[in-house]
Amino acid sequence: MDMKRRIHLELRNRTPAAVRELVLDNCKSNDGKIEGLTAEFVNLEFLSLINVGLISVSNLPKLPKLKKLELSENRIFGGLDMLAEKLPNLTHLNLSGNKLKDISTLEPLKKLECLKSLDLFNCEVTNLNDYRESVFKLLPQLTYLDGYDREDQEAPDSDAEVDGVDEEEEDEEGEDEEDEDDEDGEEEEFDEEDDEDEDVEGDEDDDEVSEEEEEFGLDEEDEDEDEDEEEEEGGKGEKRKRETDDEGEDD
């Protein structure tokens, strides 16, 4: 997919001015140049052009709010003066895996006064003697080179990202967590109500069982009384019969 079409798809019916992040990794650039990216992206803070076949950044539009630029795995060998001209507020630049051979090719980056982090992994320039010392001397505004400061202390994760973009993502994550907490609270309330309903139903069932047992007990007592009465009547009948038989014998 070419770069122009990819940009159109990434817009998703938004205006360029509404876009803060734009990822165009692995798309195709014609003639090794940036295409379809215009100065209308005035609020863009993060731009990623990894492995798009770039040879030059000469077509880069002016992006006054851009803080982080990913240009790794391309074929850029020079012409970095355009970065200072077009990206005055750039703080993070990744040029890893490009065709940069000499320290002198990095000299235009001196004009990027806000530049805080620079990555040059897998560039030939990193094989030079005193590479790190030379780059830090050339670019005194740098805090981190290839993820480490002048004292070889590793950069914390927060310094490897754009602050503004990270804050927005953290806010969104916080809102998602709050929503999940609210849902969990509602589920707990529903569970408690269900437990109460079950307890009430259980009490009602116990009452019904008790009433049935009482009724059953009364029925048994009534049956016992009826049997006793029948036995008494039967005994009286036998007694009368004996008396009658005795009178007949006397006659």
Curated annotation (Swiss-Prot):
Q: Which family does it belong to?
A: Belongs to the ANP32 family.
Q: An example Gene Ontology cellular component term from the record?
A: extracellular exosome
Q: Where do the LRR repeat units fall?
A: 16-40, 43-64, 65-84, 89-110
Expressing tissues = Expressed in heart, lung, pancreas, prostate and in spleen, thymus and placenta.
Region (Disordered), start-end ranges: 149-251
Give a short account of what the protein does: Multifunctional protein that is involved in the regulation of many processes including cell proliferation, apoptosis, cell cycle progression or transcription. Regulates the proliferation of neuronal stem cells, differentiation of leukemic cells and progression from G1 to S phase of the cell cycle. As negative regulator of caspase-3-dependent apoptosis, may act as an antagonist of ANP32A in regulating tissue homeostasis. Exhibits histone chaperone properties, able to recruit histones to certain promoters, thus regulating the transcription of specific genes. (Microbial infection) Plays an essential role in influenza A and B viral genome replication. Also plays a role in foamy virus mRNA export from the nucleus to the cytoplasm.
Basic and acidic residues biased stretches: 234-244
Question: Entry's SMART domains?
Answer: LRRcap
Provide the positions where the record notes the PTM N6-acetyllysine.
Answer: 86
The protein, known as: Acidic leucine-rich nuclear phosphoprotein 32 family member B
* Residues where Phosphothreonine is found: 244
InterPro entries referenced in this protein's UniProt entry, alphabetically: AN32, Leu-rich_rpt, LRR_dom_sf, U2A'_phosphoprotein32A_C
Q: Which GO terms describe its biological process?
A: inner ear development; negative regulation of apoptotic process; negative regulation of cell differentiation; nucleosome assembly; positive regulation of protein export from nucleus; regulation of apoptotic process; roof of mouth development; vasculature development
Location of the LRRCT domain: 123-161
Keyword Nucleus attributed: yes
For the modification Phosphoserine, the affected residues are 158
Q: Which PROSITE patterns match?
A: LRR (PS51450)
Q: How is it modified after translation?
A: Some glutamate residues are glycylated by TTLL8. This modification occurs exclusively on glutamate residues and results in a glycine chain on the gamma-carboxyl group. Directly cleaved by caspase-3/CASP3.
Upper classification of the source organism reads: Eukaryota, Metazoa, Chordata, Craniata, Vertebrata
Assembly notes: Interacts with histones H3 and H4. Interacts with KLF5; this interaction induces promoter region-specific histone incorporation and inhibition of histone acetylation by ANP32B. (Microbial infection) Interacts with Sendai virus protein M.
For the motif Nuclear localization signal, give the residue ranges: 239-242
Q: Which UniProt keywords apply?
A: Acetylation, Chaperone, Cytoplasm, Host-virus interaction, Leucine-rich repeat, Nucleus, Phosphoprotein, Repeat
Annotated Acidic residues bias: 149-233
Q: Which Pfam families match?
A: LRR_9
MF terms in GO: histone binding; RNA polymerase binding
Q: What is known of its domains?
A: Histone binding is mediated by the concave surface of the LRR region.
